[in-house]
Structure formats: C-alpha cells, structure tokens
C-alpha cells in the first residue's frame, strides 16, 4: 500500500502537473497512522474534496495543521486523540465547509500558545468538540469577508 505521505510527495514534487488530486472527493486516514512522519501538515488544492476523515491516534507529531483552498470540502472529522499535540490549526478559504467534528482528545493542544484560526468559512454552521478536544486552546481567531 502506498502511504499518504508518499502520495503527497508525489503530487507536490512531480515535474509536471498531476490532476489526480483534482478528482479526489474523500480522504480517509486510517487510525494509528503518521505519528512520526511529519511535524507540519499543510493540505491544499484538492478542489473536489468533499470530506476529510482522520482516524483515531493519527498525526501525533504534527505541530501545525493548515487546510486551505479546498473549494468543495463540506465536512472534516478528526478522530479520537488525533493531532493531540498540535498548537496551530488554520482553516482557510473553505467556502463550502459546513461542519467540523473533533472526537475525544482530538486537537488537545500543544501548549500555552495554542491557536485556532478560521478564515473565510462562509458556510460553517457548527464545530462539534467532544470530551477534551481543544482543551488547551488559548487563541481563537475568526476572520471573515462574508
């Protein structure tokens, strides 16, 4: 099986533009994945992506999460204890994003300067936070052009 990080590297580093990412409508990250692979996760430019599901206990080493320029995304689900140590979360220019669900201990927080930035999310109706999600959040920044 090709790992998610290898697919991302292939999409980003290929000499000629690849349009595979233009047709992906759903990404599901299996539980217990990518805990030591990266310190920053920046996902952008998946124009057809409608749903992002991150399983439980994923991306344990990620300090910052940026989701941006995904014009079709409607739903983000972050599984239990995923992105546990993340201190910076940015959701930017996601015009159709309707809701974000964070399960128990997801995005717990990465210390005294943890921040959540929401920029240009005109369709956002709800953020569900279960249990200890966002428990160490210190800064909430909302910027809107709508």
What is each of the regions a protein language model found here?
Residues 102-115:
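Acidic/polar low-complexity surface segments
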Residues 1-4, 127-130, 138-146:
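Leucine-rich solenoid repeat scaffolds
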């Amino acid at each position: 099986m090709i790992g998610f990080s290898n697919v991302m590297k292939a999409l980003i580093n290929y000499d000629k533009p690849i349009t595979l990412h233009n047709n992906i409508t759903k990404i599901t990250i299996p539980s217990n994945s990518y805990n030591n692979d990266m310190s920053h996760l920046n996902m952008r430019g998946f124009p057809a992506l409608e749903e992002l599901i991150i399983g439980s206990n994923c991306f344990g080493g990620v300090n910052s999460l940026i989701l941006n320029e995904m014009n079709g995304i409607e739903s983000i689900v972050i599984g239990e204890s995923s992105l546990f140590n993340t201190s910076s979360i940015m959701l930017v220019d996601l015009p159709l994003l309707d809701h974000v669900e964070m399960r128990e201990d997801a995005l717990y927080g990465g210390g005294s300067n943890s921040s959540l930035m929401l920029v240009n999310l005109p369709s956002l109706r709800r953020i569900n936070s279960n249990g200890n999600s966002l428990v160490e959040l210190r800064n909430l920044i909302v910027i809107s052009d709508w």
